[in-house]
Each structure stands twice: as C-alpha cells, then as structure tokens.
Amino acid sequence: MTDQQVYSPLTLRASGLSCGRSGLVLNENLDFSLTSGECLLLRGPNGTGKTTLLLTMAGIVAPLAGRFAPERPGDEMPLLHYCGHRNAIKPRLSVLENLGFWAELNGPTGLEPEAALAEVGLARLAGLDAGYLSAGQARRLALARLLVSLRPLWLLDEPTAALDAAGHGLVARLLDAHLAKGGLAIAATHDPISLPDRAPRVLQLEGIW
C-alpha cells in the first residue's frame, strides 16, 4: 500500500450475474471484474437495468442468478456507499446537520462534515435549511456523504444529475481522488465522465425485452 492509498486491495467479481425486478429479467449472465483504482461506467438507454444492477451489487435487491462478491482478505472496513438518484436529504435540517447525521449513521471515519462541505463547494451554505437548496446544490450535498465515512466501493446512480459544468468537474475530481486511494467506483450514467488521471471502463447494458 502506497502513502496515498487508504484502502486495502480489493477485487470485485460478477459471475453469471442476472438481475431484474417484479419478475422481469433486465440483464442476465453478466461477467466482469474490477480491481482497486478502477472505475466502471454502466451505460445504456432508460429501462435497461442500470439502477437495478447497482441495487443488486449493493445487496438491496437479490440477484436472480449468479453472484457479485468482493475479494478482500482480512479487511473489516464496511464495503460500500450507495448514492442513489434521489438525494435523501432532510429538508428541515441544516446542510451541516444533514451531513453530520450521515457521518454518525455510517461512522465518522472520513472528513469532518465542515471539511466535506468545503470540498463540494457548500461551505457558505452550512447553516441553511437543506430544503432551500437548488437541485444542483442538493446533489452536491448527497455527494458529500461519500467523504465523511470511508468506504472502498462507491456505487453511484446518475452522480452528475442536476449538476452544471462545474459540478461535472467536481464529480470527476472526487472520483479520481477516491480511485487514487485504492478505491473502486461503479456509476450508472447517461453523461460522459472524464477522469483526470485514468480512463473509466464501460459496461454497455442492452436490457432484455
């Protein structure tokens, strides 16, 4: 592990993975692997199962067949963050209180909430009720949750949704920094994501109709 690396070596493997919801098979027999420092983008039209695949990898939806499993001998750190397309913000709590809540829930093992807000450009809004945030600002707050608790795997559903060009750049920087620490990321996205120091891999999903 280098001085920059935070996470122990990790490999993710999907073997014969099939997923779907409500009896509908959306993708089947997926095989791929991902190792520390890699980013995988899930691409495909609406309805091809990108979100369902993320939920399956997060353990929220059971696979229909096959398996998705981490290989990380001896590492007891919680595995993943799942950041869905909904921001899950409490509108009557302040921006800082929202982030403090998530830090306590997931374990305050990363940045202090104030520092995380600065990283995503929300420091001046820390005392504002979160219900007053714009859509882009709310997305930045959701992304700040990734920074307050350490998890090697980030599962992101449309991370750039509602973000302007500066916000797209923020997502790229956050991802690049996470990968440089030995983390992994899998993101479902319609938007191109260009990382400063590495090229993401792409898994094109076609769905089953």
Outline where the language-model segments fall.
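Q-loop/switch helix immediately C-terminal to the Walker
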Residues: 86, 91-107
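Conserved ABC transporter NBD signature motif
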Residues: 62-78
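Conserved ABC ATPase signature
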Residues: 129-137
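Helix-to-loop junction immediately C-terminal to a conserved catalytic motif
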Residues: 58
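Hydrophobic anchor residue at the start of the ABC signature
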Residues: 143, 182
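Catalytic Walker B motif of ABC-type/P-loop ATPase nucleotide-binding domains
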Residues: 154-158
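Conserved ABC ATPase "signature" region
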Residues: 111-126
